[in-house]
Amino acid sequence: MNFGNKIKCSICKKKIFLREKNLFFPFCSKKCKIIDLYQWISGKYKLF
């Protein structure tokens, strides 16, 4: 079955499908989503 293009999770670099039913998109899992949220809260990410 063809789900379309693959992208990489920005946290763990696991490949995921663009059209895959994923509640945590653009991350591969809840864990990666929480890690990203923590990085925003802790100030690792900044908007200029």
UniProtKB/Swiss-Prot annotation:
Zn(2+) binds at residues 9, 12, 28, 32. Disulfide bonds: none annotated. The keyword Zinc applies. One of its GO terms (molecular function) is zinc ion binding. SUPFAM superfamilies: Glucocorticoid receptor-like (DNA-binding domain). Gene3D superfamilies: Erythroid Transcription Factor GATA-1, subunit A. Its cofactor is Zn(2+). The keyword Zinc applies. Keywords: Metal-binding, Zinc. One of its GO terms (biological process) is regulation of DNA-templated transcription. It comes from the Bacteria. Binds 1 zinc ion. Interacts with GyrB. HAMAP family: DNA_gyrase_inhibitor_YacG. Inhibits all the catalytic activities of DNA gyrase by preventing its interaction with DNA. Acts by binding directly to the C-terminal domain of GyrB, which probably disrupts DNA binding by the gyrase. Belongs to the DNA gyrase inhibitor YacG family. This is DNA gyrase inhibitor YacG. It comes from Wigglesworthia glossinidia brevipalpis. The gene is yacG.
